[in-house]
Design a protein with these regions (language model features):
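Bacterial N-terminal signal peptides that target proteins for export
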Residues: 1-8
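Bacterial N-terminal signal peptides
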Residues: 8-15
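Active-site signature of cysteine proteases
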Residues: 21-22, 42, 146-320
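Short, low-complexity, disordered segments immediately C-terminal to signal peptides
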Residues: 22-30
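Active-site nucleophile-adjacent alpha helix/oxyanion-hole segment immediately C-terminal to the catalytic cysteine
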Residues: 31-166, 173, 203-212, 269, ...
Length: 320
């Protein structure tokens, strides 16, 4: 038994060392970026422990659209999280609070939106608590409303903006009238050489002053929120895309950047173009809440990108 134990211990040590090497490579990189394209946006917010990056990214995208049109406003993700929580607990057999940007659009069409200053609160409750108490709320639905009002706050029936009064649904129609035209482009099973279609689409939109919602895998060794970068760290990383261990997350792409000449570049990632993403985990990282995604990382780990101009392309591509 001892030789077998030693053998397995050696394997575990080797795997641990490889993991440490890959993570250390990300952590020891000293990359500064020169931003060549930047789209104005609102301050970075923090989704906390709730898996609702799609809500934050979508609202941030709408906010940038409004800035582009000449006005500035901030929208409340907490307002939509309240209704998401209500639907997850009352309508789903196995709630997990996971949602895509398309799910976020459906919530907005259904419940409208409100302003950040009208509905903002630091949440002291976790989604797991609601899941653990789902059966209780099924038999006591009135208690769920009480808990939601206490945890999230009472929902406003009317909002004042620019001297006019809106309901949340009216505000949604006033702020963004093209929700029915939204669509996603899914990069499905394209040969790696043809992934330039995805990259070129993103670049062209950004060069035109249009930001993008990115939806992809952030559970890779080369993804580091503390460092604010996402790179390829392993020659075999393309095989990771088909694993079941993905962690899908949405971010708002607001710019294009390039490493400065004095930057220490990653070993396996030769990207000279990085996409500047506004994340929703606060500003406590090296890039004040931003994450720079390398072109190669985007090629390999994108599930979908969003912009209305992409037409009605959906599920034409996609990751197996």
């Amino acid at each position: 038994m001892k030789p077998q134990l030693s053998f397995f211990a050696a394997i575990l040590l080797t795997l641990f060392s490889c993991q440490q090497y890959r993570q250390k490579e990300v952590d020891r990189l000293d990359i500064t970026f020169l931003t060549t394209t930047y789209i104005k946006t609102t301050p970075v917010k923090d989704q906390g422990e709730w898996p609702v990056g799609s809500l934050y990214a979508y609202l941030s995208w709408i906010e940038s659209c409004r800035i582009h049109k000449g006005d500035s406003l901030e929208l409340s993700p907490i307002y939509l999280m309240r209704f998401l929580c209500q639907e997850e607990i009352t309508m789903r057999k196995h709630p997990d609070f996971q949602l895509t940007p398309n799910d976020a659009a459906i919530l907005m069409r259904k419940y409208g939106i409100t302003l950040y200053d009208y509905y903002r609160k630091h949440l002291n409750i976790r989604p797991e608590w609601f899941i653990q108490n789902q059966q209780f709320f099924a038999s006591h639905p009135e208690q769920l409303d009480i808990v939601l009002d206490t945890a999230f706050g009472y929902t406003p029936s009317h909002i004042m903006l620019y001297g006019a009064t809106y309901t949340p649904q009216d505000l949604m129609q006033s702020v963004w009238t093209d929700l029915s035209e939204t669509s996603f482009i899914h990069p499905k099973q394209i040969a790696q050489d043809d992934n330039r279609i995805l990259i070129d689409t993103m670049k062209n939109l950004l060069y035109q002053g249009e930001s993008i919602i990115w939806y992809g895998d952030t559970l890779q060794e080369g993804y580091s929120f503390p460092q604010g970068i996402a790179i390829i760290t392993d020659k075999d990383s393309p095989t990771l895309i088909s694993t079941a261990s993905r962690h899908l997350h949405a971010m708002h792409i607001i710019g294009i950047a390039h490493p400065s000449p004095r930057s220490s570049l990653p070993t396996y990632d030769s990207s000279t173009t990085y996409f500047m993403a506004k994340d929703s985990h606060g500003t406590n990282n090296r890039r004040e809440g931003m994450v720079f995604l390398s072109e190669q990382y985007v090629r390999l780990h994108t599930m979908a990108i969003f912009h209305p101009s992409l037409g009605s392309v959906e599920n034409q591509w996609g990751l197996s």
